[in-house]
Amino acid sequence: MSETENVVEAIDVHKSYGRNEVLKGITLEVARQQVMCLLGPSGSGKSTFLRCVNHLEKIDSGELKVEGIHVGYERVGNQLHELPKRKIAAQRTRIGMVFQNFNLFPHMTVLENVIEAPQRVRGIAKAEAQEKAIILLEQVGLSDKIVAYPNQLSGGQQQRVAIARAMAMEPRLMLFDEPTSALDPELVGDVLDVIKNLAASGMTMIIVTHEIGFAREIADSVVFMDEGIVVECGSPKEILENPQNPRTQAFLSKVLR
């Protein structure tokens, strides 16, 4: 794959829970090294779409590819068949995901949390995994917390560990699902700074966020979703300063008060 091709391609993606259709034909492209921010009210389908990208949720129809490969499926003729769990897990090593609520292992130290997946999933030797983990923890400003346990950290520190843990797998794509929504306001800035540094390093990212100022600063493209559809998509300037759709205008007028 060339460096200019899309990392993520979603084509007419549908997803329902029972009779509730959550995604109603999402079509999006994310180019390599692009940062896309997904905005929208609660229940608009943003987080569901993000979880579909790495097959934490199964799509009902459409296509979702990361670096040209169907995530969680293989095509046989005109049919998509779900892969075995082992192959899905292998695919997910290319995709890092950071959730709202950290999801660190409470019985492991910070260092142990970061080296667990590289050792267990990728088979990296412990010494090499530790060396890389220490560098990552330095990058997120936690080199002094290596032997601490999650319950000894603030929420912001735990989220920065979660980012380092995801990066330890050397992903090609990072997904962030409202990474600051569970944090006290004074802790948000440090986490956003880490994500900004990732963007500056060229990491391809999709970020679900309610931080409008952050989206304006970091995003190459902004997508406004509502009721399971893409309402409007464009540059931060286009969407945040001059939205064309009344639904986008109404949403921004509320959150920017």
Language-model regions: role of each:
Residues 62-76:
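Conserved ABC transporter NBD signature motif
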Residues 174-177:
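Catalytic Walker B motif of ABC-type/P-loop ATPase nucleotide-binding domains
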Residues 149-153, 157:
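Conserved ABC ATPase signature
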Residues 168-172:
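A short, proline-enriched helix->beta-strand linker immediately N-terminal to the Walker B motif
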